[in-house]
């Protein structure tokens, strides 16, 4: 009986390894011909099944850091130092031109109030760069975020610059992390180990409401799939090189499991449409693997 059980367990392990090998091969085929350095980290939260390719790639964060900033902000909400209902005065001079800012577009004259809830939604759901910097100023700067993320046990994470300070090519590479570190923070966030239950649910939902990157990871998943994610993208330099394009998040599959997918592309010379499709294809392959097991 013991021998039969052992044989069965070996069979199950072999099936898992074979399946992962198939997914790994498909992902490697997707990224093999791309003119970019690509890092991928995947984890099924419920089964703990993991896979990574270049998971330790040190990659520019870009606007992915708005997730980490939101975590640090909501930690202060949990502690009672901030409230989602509190009003924050937005000065006109804080609404900088020549940057992505739905707040500025909607309130071009500034000098008005937004609640912290509104500011977080603009920043996380709609990637507002001015909103991001206003949040950072409110919570004490990048140092607050760095210390908080490190306190969660995440070591491969660096944040030193706000959006306004990321104006030069070299500056794009200063704020950085790895696919594996991103998957790790997303997992403990989802499990409620970073924030209280109410603020965890709140942040997850405003990530589901993300309006950016519709043709990226989201395009590789079936319509209607629950996806909580954040995107990040840099400009190009004079040599048509893009420093980074990233999409990280958690999606729910039909059996109720949740899959973390962290995709970072670095030093890209492909056209944007090609890079978007690469991320979508990675998401599609991951979805197919976990829904056909």
Please give the residue ranges for each predicted region.
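Active-site SXXK
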Residues: 48, 60-90, 123, 261
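Bacterial Sec-dependent N-terminal signal peptides
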Residues: 1-22
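Structured C-terminal helix/loop/strand segments within mature extracytoplasmic catalytic/sensor domains
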Residues: 21-33, 137-138, 142-143, 184, ...
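Beta-lactamase-like hydrolase cores
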Residues: 17-57
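Mid-domain, small-residue-enriched loop/turn segments at the edges of structured enzyme/sensor domains
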Residues: 133-194
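Extracytoplasmic
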Residues: 33-37, 54-56, 62-64, 83-85, ...
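Acidic helix-start/capping segments at beta-turn-to-alpha-helix junctions
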Residues: 84-103, 139-140, 206
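Conserved catalytic neighborhood of penicillin-recognizing serine enzymes
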Residues: 95-133
